Amino acid sequence: MKNINWSGYEWLTQERWGQYHPSKDFCYYDPKAVSIDENQKLTLKTHFNPKTFKGKKINVGVGLISCVEKFSYGYFEIEAKLPKGKNLWPAFWMWSFESWPPEVDIFEGYT
């Protein structure tokens, strides 16, 4: 697991339970698909990088960040180049740290 520091907070580059989500078995969360440049611009990518999880080969690694810390306010901006292909799920979500509802969808698409 790779943690990053960005915008004054600590972020995971995978979900809290790990790199692989059994109900989303078409991709896994890959720390190599997350980068921050010298201007603090965050880039999340999707790339072909096969790995095996619990005996199942998954070909696509995706970038994801999830904040370790709780915060209440902030400014978020997205500029997106959406991927083409089958079984892709580009999204920009804000998740609740401890309460319901679990997420706010800023943008979500599924192919």
What are these regions (language model features)?
Residues 1-111:
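GH16 jelly-roll
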